[in-house]
Amino acid sequence: MSLDVNASEVLRIIKEKIKDFDQQIFSEEIGEVISVKDGVVIACGLENAEFNEKVVFPNGEIGLIQSIEYDHVGIVILTNTQDIKEGDTVRRTKEALRIPVGKKLLGRVIDPLGNPLDGAGQIFADAYSPIEVKAPGILDRQSVKEPLQTGIKVIDLLIPIGRGQRELIIGDRQTGKTTIALDSIINQRDINKNLPDEKKLYCVYVAIGQKCSTVARIMKTLQEQGAMDYTTIVLAGASDSAQSQFLAPYAGCSIGEYFRDNGMHCLIVYDDLSKHAVAYRQMSLLLRRPPGREAYPGDVFYIHSRLLERAAKMSDKHGAGSLTALPIIETQAGDVSAYIPTNVISITDGQIFLETELFNKGVKPAVNVGLSVSRVGSAAQIKAIKQVARSIKLELAQYREMEAFAQFGADLDETTQALLEKGKKLTELLKQNQHETLPVEEQVVLMFAANEGYFDNIDVTGISTAAKNLLGSFRLYHRDLLEDIKEKSIIGDLASLSSALQGCKTTNA
């Protein structure tokens, strides 16, 4: 029996059969865990792995590739390491580590992976951003030109900070470094009050290797001061792994960059980068990288430079947003010439140097005006401050120098005695209690009064009270002059200000 085969019919049947065939082919690169030790996994088989790539283990644990050798890769574990064992598979994701960013994170405390730590529920973020982002290029930036008011007299008047600047806060332990950073955050409360959302300054506080009790106290302070509404805290505590502490500042920076890249403004505090360098050293030694000076790896400068270069004032073409960084470095016995301090000093745009000796004398904030500098902030300083604070830094530096000679008990001429007396009064005038920030217009009035000789006949011990009384009188009777300075950023009517000052002098005498 013959069978007629119609070729076209067969072709039609085959076409119909494969028409709805939609089998997709997935390619995966899977490696095998060779060893697990101290939060570091050595794996083989990931031949095309990339540096800083996210990898996933069977139970959902996340790792980050931090070392690529000829026949294996080094992976740091970012989650629980207990469930990972020798022989487990590890899978490439071909993507970078991403974290949630946006306004939904304001008022929250999170870990470096974006998980909430405050018990206030899940975070539904506006967007996700990679932790590692390339810093803006030269053409994407513009020079710093807007002031960032900290509310701290000695900083706003003598060591001004501009939006988009990197200003280092450096000093020994217990000298008030964190207090300066917190006061800078708290001062934005009143500034933000009457501004639209896109003009407000948002804040990110990154706690690296801090005790959880310390961070809880910081959070409570910010809540009491009404500052948590515009602040996010990123916490990698002292009990967290070295890799978590290493990632924390990069995660915080990505959160800050969301505001910067959307035409808004953000202030980020890294507290502190000394502990960050120690965490990176620990991680690098576990990855068998060769140690260098003080056992830090050779690229320890790069980990801080690539982080701090992400702070910038963006060009008008890119929205004119800004990210201002206040990194903190803890020194040992005032040694600013150590490895990490000199690295960060060379990266930043200036430093605020805090001294134990001044702190112990009761000068708070304990800022050494002679050693502190702001390399770009003066361009952002408002004209009113330039009018009153031009000579103060020099006078204070001369006072510190003369004070050393005066201790020898030598007979001093009248000019030197006058310089010492004025220096003491200026130092007293610049003292400030923590969390008692001053608006810029009131700082201008105080310095104008000092220049006009308002405090000349007042004893050093009475300077603080006299300054409070003066500001109280201005708030009560001369609010219009304060508002004029605030709005115009310049002392427009010198005669009226001098007249008001004389009136206060008579009233408070």
UniProtKB/Swiss-Prot annotation:
Record-linked PROSITE patterns: ATPASE_ALPHA_BETA (PS00152)
Family, as annotated: Belongs to the ATPase alpha/beta chains family.
Subunit: F-type ATPases have 2 components, CF(1) - the catalytic core - and CF(0) - the membrane proton channel. CF(1) has five subunits: alpha(3), beta(3), gamma(1), delta(1), epsilon(1). CF(0) has three main subunits: a(1), b(2) and c(9-12). The alpha and beta chains form an alternating ring which encloses part of the gamma chain. CF(1) is attached to CF(0) by a central stalk formed by the gamma and epsilon chains, while a peripheral stalk is formed by the delta and b chains.
Lineage per the UniProt record: Bacteria, Pseudomonadati, Pseudomonadota, Alphaproteobacteria, Rickettsiales
PANTHER family: ATP SYNTHASE SUBUNIT ALPHA, MITOCHONDRIAL
Gene name, Swiss-Prot/TrEMBL: atpA
Bilayer topology term: Peripheral membrane protein
Subcellular location: Cell inner membrane
Record-given protein name: ATP synthase subunit alpha
Keyword Methyltransferase: no
Source superkingdom: Bacteria
GO MF annotations in UniProt: ADP binding; ATP binding; proton-transporting ATP synthase activity, rotational mechanism
Site (Required for activity): S372
Organism: Neorickettsia sennetsu (strain ATCC VR-367 / Miyayama) (Ehrlichia sennetsu)
HAMAP family: ATP_synth_alpha_bact (MF_01346)
Keywords recorded for this protein, A-Z: ATP synthesis, ATP-binding, Cell inner membrane, Cell membrane, CF(1), Hydrogen ion transport, Ion transport, Membrane, Nucleotide-binding, Translocase, Transport
EC number in record: 7.1.2.2
Gene Ontology CC entries for this record: plasma membrane; proton-transporting ATP synthase complex
